[in-house]
Amino acid sequence: MKPEIKKILMQMLSDAGINSCANTDDFTWLFTAVKDNAEQLRAHLQTVTYNTTGDYKTTFFVNGLRAIITTWLDNDCADSVEQMNELAMREYRKLFSIAF
């Protein structure tokens, strides 16, 4: 994962009062933190937007991932963390043409 994306996502969680350690190269850590703090994040994501600078692909991906997280929360995290990670990784690979 691009360091800039990881930094933005960690800031998003931090802004919501959630301390999470991005200790994997995929998005498992993110979806685990989201699921563990669903109510707190649901309220936070309704009131905030994140701007990135520079790279259009990064901006596109981060805002798309935010929308996916919001939808997942609206569905009461019905899909597993693993399924959400697979979705995010698939889209990440398509956009950035990177294989893990």
Model regions and ranges:
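Alpha-helical bundle regulatory/interaction domains
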Residues: 1-100
